[in-house]
Amino acid sequence: MLEHERIALSMIAFITGMMAFIESMIAVPAASTAMAADALSFVQHSVSAGFALRAATGFKRHRWTILLQGAVMMVLGALVCLIAARRLVQGSFPHPLTMIIMGFIALSANFSACTILLLSRRQLTGIMSVWRVSRADAVGSISVIAAALAVVATRSNIPDVVIGGAMAGLFVAQGWRILYTGRADANQMR
């Protein structure tokens, strides 16, 4: 593996991993379901970059790691769905200014990761999987900003809960798809 490839993937994994941590820690006091769901997207991006980094070193991804990734995605997505339901019932009001600021910080992290991808596109072997989750991260960050603006406009927590719940639901579905595909692949290899 080339040194610049390892550095690029390491930088992407670090940026997205830090954003996952920061956004998940700020989502709690901000009472934002959309931010919690967006943090999941960054977790997925960091894991994908990590697997691409390992694949570039000749590591063969074992079937159990695929199944584990799918199961973890489903569990985390389900937890955010439960948080959304609880916030809907309790009526906790998110902090829109915090959501907007974090949305723009997350977009800048996405921009940084995409810039690294574009500058390294000829060298990276696992670029397609990392690129797919980069797009999903950007959509998630824009959704956080949109949810914050809708919260301000409606003076309700419903936009944040709906957007965050929908993002988390997609995460559960994606985890299920990974589990299903991973099991099918494992059965074919027997």
Where are these regions (language model features)?
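Alpha-helical transmembrane cores and adjacent cytosolic helix/loop segments
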Residues: 1-190
